[in-house]
Amino acid sequence: MTLAVKVPLKEGEIVRRRLIELGALDNTYKIKREGNFLLIPVKFPVKGFEVVEAELEQVSRRPNSYREIVNVPQELRRFLPTSFDIIGNIAIIEIPEELKGYAKEIGRAIVEVHKNVKAVYMKGSKIEGEYRTRELIHIAGENITETIHRENGIRLKLDVAKVYFSPRLATERMRVFKMAQEGEVVFDMFAGVGPFSILLAKKAELVFACDINPWAIKYLEENIKLNKVNNVVPILGDSREIEVKADRIIMNLPKYAHEFLEHAISCINDGGVIHYYGFGPEGDPYGWHLERIRELANKFGVKVEVLGKRVIRNYAPRQYNIAIDFRVSF
């Protein structure tokens, strides 16, 4: 039995709102109709209303996290990851060594809690090689690797086993989009399947989107059609071999972007902006990268104005993924 306010049907919605305002509505029980009256569950007696005891059906609460239902020994629960990536309908999780034996149980719990997730993979290696891919080990759900991911109002088709993609950069991509101006020419030097390129195409006159991974370019071409954009030019190859002039350059290859910086500066128009990404240590994550930028500015005889810099996320213990935006003037 629980407490409920008894009100005529026609007054039900008005009373419900009033109970919410008073903090009295008990959402753990369902409202029940009884003849021409409603029984609205409350946490405590409310002055001015008829309060009765009633048998009401409890609202079944779905767990908020897989951690609430996963079956692992109590002494190992502290090792359970608190976050993982969801790309389209595929979840990718890093499982610590202590829990590798419970990988399938963790996968099962993720599928049960996240109804949109159809497949779960465990990271089997770090991101490696020229194509920036990693080994993925299937632990639950369907054995699929191709999906369509939605972010920032665009759709991105991709294969998580064949291309690099991080949903954690969605906010960063929107930040760059908001900085972009109408009618620009953009050079996305490491475009992947197009999360920057296709988003920026909404403002740009033209986007040159380059990647060395043929699978990335294949999906980029599909995503151009999927999003009905006609101003993105996909280019397969090393971006250092692409001779273009651009008002805005995206350099999202944190581990190696510094090796492409000289070419980026040679491609930028007067007054153009370069969005540079790198990895840096705790304490001074920007120093080495800023020094490199200034060295090349001196070499080219151009002026550099740093517009902003920020830590995007932790990459490894005491290592950060950073971004530096700078304007180049001749």
From Swiss-Prot:
Its main location: cytoplasm. It catalyses: guanosine(37) in tRNA + S-adenosyl-L-methionine = N(1)-methylguanosine(37) in tRNA + S-adenosyl-L-homocysteine + H(+). One of its GO terms (biological process) is tRNA N1-guanine methylation. It is an enzyme of class 2 (transferase). The keyword Transmembrane helix does not apply. Keywords: Cytoplasm, Methyltransferase, S-adenosyl-L-methionine, Transferase, tRNA processing. The keyword Cytoplasm applies. Belongs to the class I-like SAM-binding methyltransferase superfamily. TRM5/TYW2 family. PANTHER family: TRNA (GUANINE(37)-N1)-METHYLTRANSFERASE, TRNA METHYLTRANSFERASE. This is tRNA (guanine(37)-N(1))-methyltransferase Trm5b. It comes from Pyrococcus abyssi (strain GE5 / Orsay).
